[in-house]
Amino acid sequence: MSYNIAVAGKGGTGKTSLTGLLIDTLIHEDKKPILVVDADANANINEVLGVEVEATIGQIREEANMTEKRGNSFPGGMTKAQFLQWKLNSILVEGNGYDLLVMGRSEGEGCYCFVNGILREQVQKISGQYN
């Protein structure tokens, strides 16, 4: 049986520390694989987990938008949606017992609309592989 666990609260209250401890506990109790999603604009769960993040969902969104703005085509004749899916698969960080996706910065002041949509779709597609 799989579960979704969300940790939310005000800044500086220990959400990242709690999440790191929770992930560690779940791994030690063999409740893996785990999909960790850091949806904070100031994401840093990777530092607690000791892994490096190459890119965020926000960064690949920017890359796709710039490709379109310049009038360039996506590699291999891909659509924007296919390009985003391909890039999302490439930014998934594989850790010991968990995988990590990082959302990154918002589109603009207070707006996470497009990034949240991408994140939601990606999580729905791959969540069946995780506990």
Predicted regions and their residues:
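N-terminal phosphate/diphosphate-binding loop that engages ATP/GTP or pyrophosphate donors
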Residues: H28-N96
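Walker A/P-loop phosphate-binding motif and the immediately C-terminal alpha-helix
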Residues: Y3-A41
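Phosphate-binding/switch loop-helix module in NTP-utilizing enzymes
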Residues: G76-N131
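Short, glycine/charged-enriched secondary-structure capping and boundary segments
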Residues: L21-L22, L49-V53, V115-N116
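Secondary-structure boundary/capping motif
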Residues: G14-K15, I45, C111
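Short coil/turn connectors at secondary-structure junctions
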Residues: M1-Y3, D30-K32, N96, Q129-N131
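Signal for well-folded cores of large energy- and translation-related assemblies
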Residues: I27, G50, V123-S127
